[in-house]
Swiss-Prot record:
Amino-acid positions noted as binding ATP in the UniProt annotation, renumbered to this chain: 10-18, 38, 119
Spans through the membrane: none
Reaction(s) this enzyme catalyzes, per UniProt: L-citrulline + L-aspartate + ATP = 2-(N(omega)-L-arginino)succinate + AMP + diphosphate + H(+)
Gene Ontology cellular component terms for the protein in this record: cytoplasm
CDD domains, per the entry: ASS
Database matches in PANTHER family: ARGININOSUCCINATE SYNTHASE
Keywords, sorted A to Z: Amino-acid biosynthesis, Arginine biosynthesis, ATP-binding, Cytoplasm, Ligase, Nucleotide-binding
GO molecular function (one): ATP binding
Gene that this sequence comes from: argG
InterPro entries named among the record's database cross-references: Arginosuc_syn_C, Arginosuc_syn_N, Arginosuc_synth, Arginosuc_synth_CS, Arginosuc_synth_type_1_subfam, AS_cat/multimer_dom_body, Rossmann-like_a/b/a_fold
Pathway: Amino-acid biosynthesis; L-arginine biosynthesis; L-arginine from L-ornithine and carbamoyl phosphate: step 2/3
Name of the protein: Argininosuccinate synthase
């Protein structure tokens, strides 16, 4: 008896998910494998991927356009939360996983499957993200994880696939593993596993090199309403179009490359190369506008909670009660985040050079100026400093005896 009768497999067209199709059928006795591939704005032509799944033995090969919910329900909350895992990585890949898992569960219900499956390996982050999301949404569904159990190396998996008629998509000339969606690209494996090897220019596709970037700087303006980016240079765009334009502008000037050592959920460190030009640009602009419009104590608390929000998403806990509670805090703060941020793009840099808010700015020029218009009561400072420093003076006096 097989491990399941009908399985819906999260499918990308890569080595592991392609090999999963015959493996589930031949090794685990699954009667029927249905694949689901998500269109997340990666720009690939998905029809060849759909046909590849059928050639590999899938009974049905489904493709779903998830671009709009990906941006509206996942990217925009991440921008509002200034989500940067370990202060650097803007979660471009991690944000996609709970959405794919959600749709995977929906497809399983629609076709009457008794299990879902994915092709994540045993030491990656995505296995955690998929398993936890599916458990939260459909605890009754079995989750099959052949790539976690088959103990094949990447080379052995490619060879297994070739025996089953699946062509290898990776050559020795291109040994990289690449994940791509509208928010960015992640590149790993091959020579990049040596943390001292510089990434070759060939691995980048969304960003110009510093040498190829324009020599002339470009100033752009990004408008936010309730924490969401809504316009660039005065042109209002829908959320998907705005992300695309931010990618184009930032990428043209070589901004958005990351080369980092990252702490994975499973406890190991990995070397990751990311291209996330638009998302990083929008987070930087959003942070700056918050500095102008949020009260100091709210801003300090939000910066602390942002780190926890990013960690929860990275660790696969999108559907957790704590993440839901943090969303409530983030959303409440964003009603004040309205205004404009001006950024100068030049040779890999994105420097904030201006910010304004007609309705919510807490920058009062008469209080901040050192000129003749100064309305700050300097005499009040003496009493404030006395009270503020009282605990220190009492502590010092007690030490002296």
């Amino acid at each position: 008896m097989g491990r399941a009768k009908k399985v819906v497999l999260a499918y990308s067209g890569g080595v592991d998910t392609s090999v999963c199709i015959p493996y589930l059928k031949h090794e685990w006795g699954v009667d029927e494998v249905i694949t689901f591939a998500a269109d997340l704005g990666q720009g690939d032509e998905l029809d060849p991927i759909r046909l590849k799944a059928l050639d590999a033995g899938a009974s049905q090969s489904l493709v779903g356009d998830l671009i709009e919910p990906f941006v509206e329900e996942f990217a925009l909350p991440a921008i509002r939360a200034n989500a940067l895992y370990e202060g650097r990585y803007p979660l471009s890949t991690a944000l996609a996983r709970p959405l794919i898992a959600r749709r995977l569960v929906e497809v399983a219900r629609e076709v009457g499957a008794d299990a879902v499956a994915h092709g994540c390996t045993g030491k990656g982050n995505d296995q955690v993200r998929f398993d936890l999301a599916i458990a939260a949404l459909a605890p009754d569904l079995k989750v099959l994880t052949p790539a976690r159990e088959w103990s094949m190396s990447r080379e052995e998996a490619i060879a297994y696939g070739e025996r089953c008629g699946i062509p290898a998509p990776v050559s020795k000339k291109s040994p990289y593993s690449i994940d791509l969606n509208l928010l960015g690209r992640s590149i790993e494996a091959g020579p990049l596993e040596d943390p001292m090897v510089a990434p070759p220019e060939e691995v980048f596709a969304m960003t110009s090199s510093i040498d190829a970037a324009p020599s002339q700087a470009q100033d752009i303006e990004i408008r936010f309403e309730a924490g969401n980016p809504v316009a660039i240079d005065g042109v209002r765009l829908d959320s998907v179009g705005l992300i695309k334009e931010a990618n184009r502008l930032a990428g043209r000037h070589g901004f958005g490359r990351l080369d980092i050592i990252e702490n994975r959920v499973v406890g190991i460190k990995s070397r990751e190369i990311y291209e996330t030009p638009g998302l990083l640009l929008l987070i930087r602009a959003h942070q700056e506008l918050e500095s102008l419009t949020l009260a100091a104590d709210v801003l300090r608390m939000k910066r602390q909670l942002e780190m926890q929000w990013a960690e929860l998403v990275y660790q696969g806990l999108w559907f957790s009660p704590l993440k839901d509670a943090l969303d409530g805090f983030m959303d409440r703060t964003q009603i004040y985040v309205n205004g404009l941020v001006r950024i100068r793009l030049h040779k890999g840099n994105a420097m904030v050079i201006g910010r304004s808010s007609d309705t919510n700015s807490l920058y009062i020029s008469e209080m901040a100026t050192y000129g003749s218009e100064d309305n700050f009561d300097h005499r009040a400072a003496e009493g404030f400093i006395y009270i503020w420093g009282l605990p220190s003076r009492l502590w010092a006096a007690a030490r002296r005896g």
